[in-house]
């Protein structure tokens, strides 16, 4: 039997249903950067709206991105789980963390509507060091769960791990001050010339584990736009919050 990593209940899934209900409730977020908005919970009538935070109303940090969705906030208890998955050599967390994403109807719908689901790529050096791309594992687990949720009548989203490439090795964004992150990541992504024609007029969903400033998402979205993508949405497991 398994023990819940949050409440330590026996027997339970890696993350039990009670903890998902308690700590991963849908929250009202900016539709463009996924920052948490000052509302305790998301009323049903808001789901189809596109609320914006004050910063995005003035000037978006991710102008190449059409929409942005996040499942949870990058804080307790999810920060510890994500860090173990990403840095602790435990790829087996992918399924449980993808479950936090499929708990949100808007995320399930976004995956169902996209033409292509692209995981945020790692540079080959970082991939070799870590041993796996956590965003690719999340994408695979998410697609499987969404497909199960929707039933066999709906085609699964297509995942392409090599269409979007990391063209240069950069300092990890998490090690840099916020002001330096955009400069660090500028020009670090490109779409494979062989696959660029297949992105023409496509609805693309870019998946990453954590969104902080949006610098990586913006740089990747710019490359996808340049290749001809008609719509670029960003989907993240967790969003950091303002201090």
Cite the ranges covered by each PLM segment:
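Glycine-rich phosphate/pyrophosphate-handling loop used in enzymes and phosphotransfer proteins
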Residues: 1-243
């Amino acid at each position: 039997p398994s023990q819940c990593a949050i409440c330590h209940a026996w027997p339970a899934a890696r993350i039990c249903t009670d903890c998902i209900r308690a700590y991963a409730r849908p929250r009202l977020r900016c539709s463009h950067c996924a920052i948490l908005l000052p509302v305790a919970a998301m009323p049903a009538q808001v789901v189809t709206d596109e609320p914006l935070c004050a910063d995005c109303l003035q000037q978006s940090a991710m102008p190449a991105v059409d929409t942005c969705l996040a499942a949870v906030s990058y804080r307790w208890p999810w920060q510890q789980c994500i860090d173990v998955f990403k840095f602790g050599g435990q790829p087996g967390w992918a399924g449980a963390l993808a479950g936090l994403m499929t708990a949100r109807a808007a995320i399930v719908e976004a995956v169902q509507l996209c033409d292509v689901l692209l995981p945020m790529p790692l540079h080959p050096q970082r991939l070799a060091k870590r041993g796996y791309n956590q965003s690719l594992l999340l994408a695979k687990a998410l697609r499987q769960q969404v497909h199960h949720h929707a039933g066999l009548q709906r085609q699964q989203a297509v995942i392409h791990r090599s269409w979007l490439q990391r063209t240069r090795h950069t300092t990890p964004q998490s090690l840099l001050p916020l002001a330096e992150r955009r400069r660090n990541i500028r020009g670090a992504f490109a779409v494979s010339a062989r696959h660029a024609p297949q992105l023409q007029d496509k609805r693309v969903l870019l998946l990453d584990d954590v969104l902080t400033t949006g610098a990586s998402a913006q740089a990747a979205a710019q490359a996808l736009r340049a290749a001809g993508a008609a719509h670029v949405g960003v989907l993240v497991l967790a969003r950091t919050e303002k201090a």
